[in-house]
A protein has these predicted regions:
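N-terminal start-of-domain structural block
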Residues: 1-17, 24, 149-224
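Cytosolic, low-complexity regulatory segments enriched in Ser/Pro/Gly with interspersed Lys/Arg
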Residues: 1-73
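Primarily EF-hand calcium-binding motifs
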Residues: 51-85, 92-119, 129-144, 167-194, ...
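Amphipathic regulatory helices of Ca2+-sensor modules
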Residues: 75-91, 99, 112-124, 144-163, ...
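Core solenoid repeat modules with strong leucine/isoleucine-rich periodicity
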Residues: 143, 193-200, 208-213, 222-225, ...
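C-terminal interaction modules of eukaryotic adaptor/scaffold proteins
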Residues: 337-403
Length: 403
């Protein structure tokens, strides 16, 4: 009977661990401040536990002095264990037997390159440093960066990148917008307006951004880097050139001049039906999403973006009716160029053969990504000059080089 009297009410478990603390609300500034302070102190402590440049130099000297084969810069497991006993407590977590096994390069005696070891530690330290750096901008403390968090991060990173020194201050907000869109386009698949910090660390975008610290970066590498000044200025310049009425937005007629100027009318109609517009006009942010999709057509995220536009009935697949809806405009352009229009039946068979969908009459996004030719498939349906290049690929390949 006493047992029943002393029983705790359901849900009350004072002794058990608490795994979840509610986030402070907007009208709780004191709790918010306390949470921010606690996180900031935690990140500071973590930062102090990282290896600094002097400790990394010291590690290299220890590795250098204990390599088993000085001419080859290789180390045996026995010497590796010796190094483990010599390094500081901060370094020890990096020097495990698992790491040694992971860095094996097929050496017949099971030795490992000391350079590989050192680079492994450097990379790990950099990742931890960057994770702490990004976490400082995580306003909710949930391991995500929102669009505003990312904007703050890149705005503060800007002055540390020598390759961006030449940018006009008035262009900064457009640059930040251009940089942030790439993170959101590729890493925010569910369009929640936020990106996981772990996903940022796992992709190459930060490497591309930090490449701009290199003052000697070649023109060619800059042009290939979305985050470089030439790339950002090129994209913004194209937007300004398209904006013929200079109102800062693009209407359908203006967007028709994009790229080769041969995106089809049905595709442009669907772009304006599907994407966020303001009184039928597109802003720079939406334009950037479209550019990222069209410049990276082979990537799954770009295919998902373009598939949504092609799926005119929102049915989750493309069928012969949908393909014909888009291809008619390609046939019209062929006639306008004085060429004989290709039969839709032939193209339809070719497209289905290209994708080999699980259902022989329906092409899903998964089919498109899996076939490895999604970029060609999409291009044939939405852009006349890409279709023409595909149609005449044998002739182009057979032509002698102009060099």
């Amino acid at each position: 009977h006493m047992k029943h009297l002393t029983k705790k009410p359901p849900g009350e478990n004072k002794g058990g661990p608490r795994f979840y603390n509610k986030l402070p609300k907007e009208d709780e500034p004191l709790r918010q401040k306390l949470r921010e302070e606690s996180r900031s102190n935690l990140l500071k402590r973590r930062s102090q536990n990282l290896l600094d440049n002097n400790e990394l130099r010291e590690l290299w000297m220890i590795l250098d002095q204990n390599q088993s084969y000085p001419d080859e810069q290789l180390i045996t497991y026995a010497d590796y264990q010796k190094v483990c006993s010599l390094v500081s407590p901060k370094v020890k977590p990096y020097f495990t037997s698992i790491v040694f096994a992971k860095l094996q390069q097929g050496d017949s005696q099971g030795r490992v390159s000391i350079m590989s070891l050192f680079n492994y530690v450097m990379r790990k330290v950099w990742l931890q440093q960057t994770r702490i750096g990004l976490s400082l901008y995580d306003s909710s403390g949930q391991g995500y960066l929102t669009e505003i968090d990312l904007e703050n991060y890149i705005t503060e990173l800007l002055p540390t990148l020598p390759q961006l020194e030449g940018l006009e201050k008035s262009f900064y907000s457009f640059y930040v917008c251009t940089a942030v869109r790439k993170f959101l386009f590729f890493l925010d698949g569910v369009r929640a307006g936020r990106v996981r910090i772990l996903d940022i660390l796992a992709c190459s975008f930060l490497d591309d951004l930090l490449e701009l610290r290199d003052e000697e970066l070649s023109k060619e590498l800059q042009e290939q880097n979305w985050f470089s000044a030439p790339s950002a200025l090129r994209i913004y310049g194209q937007y300004l050139n398209l904006d013929r009425d200079h109102n800062g937005m693009l209407n359908k007629t203006e967007l028709a001049g994009y790229g080769s100027g041969t995106l089809t009318q049905p595709f442009l109609d669907r772009v304006f039906q599907t994407l966020l517009t303001y009184s039928g006009e597109m802003d720079y942010k939406t334009y950037l999403d479209l550019v990222l999709a069209l410049e990276n057509r082979a990537e799954p995220q770009a295919l998902a973006f373009l598939f949504r536009i092609l799926d005119i009935n929102n049915q989750g697949y493309l069928d012969a009716f949908t393909l014909n809806y888009f291809f008619r405009a390609i046939q019209d352009q062929m006639r306008a160029h004085g060429a004989e229009a290709v039969s839709f039946e032939d193209v339809k068979d070719e497209l289905f053969d290209m994708v080999r969908p699980k259902n022989p009459e329906r092409i899903t996004l998964n089919d498109l990504v899996a076939c490895g030719q999604g970029d060609t498939f999409v291009s044939i349906l939405i852009e006349f000059h890409r279709f023409w290049a595909y149609e005449n690929r044998e002739a182009v390949t057979a032509e002698p080089s102009q060099d």
